[in-house]
Amino acid sequence: MSSSVHNNTGPVQLPEERRFLSASEAAALERELLEEYRFGRQQLVELCGHASAVAVTKAFPLPSLSRKQRTVLVVCGPEQNGAVGLACARHLRVFEYQPSIFCPARSADALHRDLTTQCEKMDIPFLSFLPAEVRLIDDAYGLVVDAVLGPGVRLAEAGGHCARALATLKRLSIPLVSLDVPSGWDAEAGGDAKDAVQPDVLVSLAAPKSCAGRFSGRLHFVAGRFVPDDVRRKFGLHLPKYTGTDCVASL
């Protein structure tokens, strides 16, 4: 039930506290950050990319990995989630992992171009194609980051290159980390579609979306410490507290 507080004009209804946001609420929260708080799009992508990389370090700590397991394939789509993936790859390189990037469909967006240039300048390799034989990927990498689609992007809209990439990701044996909404999932209903990936780790950006309630993988992180407290209250978000200086929290 929703709660209420009193001011000089009488009780004020507060939203019901919950963990998950609908697709429309998630879009409204992002608009609040962009329009009311004057966050820039690049700023949000950078914050989410950094936090996503930190989540990877918590799920797969570098000291516990063999040299081969430190190799990370980051698959980046042409929309905003792909930009987050590019930023994530750059931060993983700073954290001494060994990322490579595959973009099934390159974006002409200026932000994508800038992030791509940054990754290239840091000598992060870009694959020209994704092997269809999954054994080659399983043998070459320790884990994969799925930044292909994200919320609000349907597979039918993304094109055949993204569909083929997802068909390959679905068959991998190595761990899969999805950013925000696992590719192929409906942001509301979850991942029952035949083309949906089933990640081992989910990193929800800003706040978990409704589909995260159906996630049954190993670890679920929320990367939203940058969301101001009054915005959390406005949207009725009841999430774990962040520890110390951590930018992610485990759900």
From Swiss-Prot:
InterPro entries recorded: YjeF_N_dom, YjeF_N_dom_sf, YJEFN_prot_NAXE-like
GO BP: any one term: membrane raft distribution
Pfam families xrefs: YjeF_N
Higher taxonomy: Eukaryota, Metazoa, Chordata, Craniata, Vertebrata
Record-linked Gene3D superfamilies: YjeF N-terminal domain
Protein name from the UniProt record: YjeF N-terminal domain-containing protein 3
Family matches, as PANTHER family: NAD(P)H-HYDRATE EPIMERASE, YJEF N-TERMINAL DOMAIN-CONTAINING PROTEIN 3
Subunit structure: Interacts with APOA1. Binds to HDL.
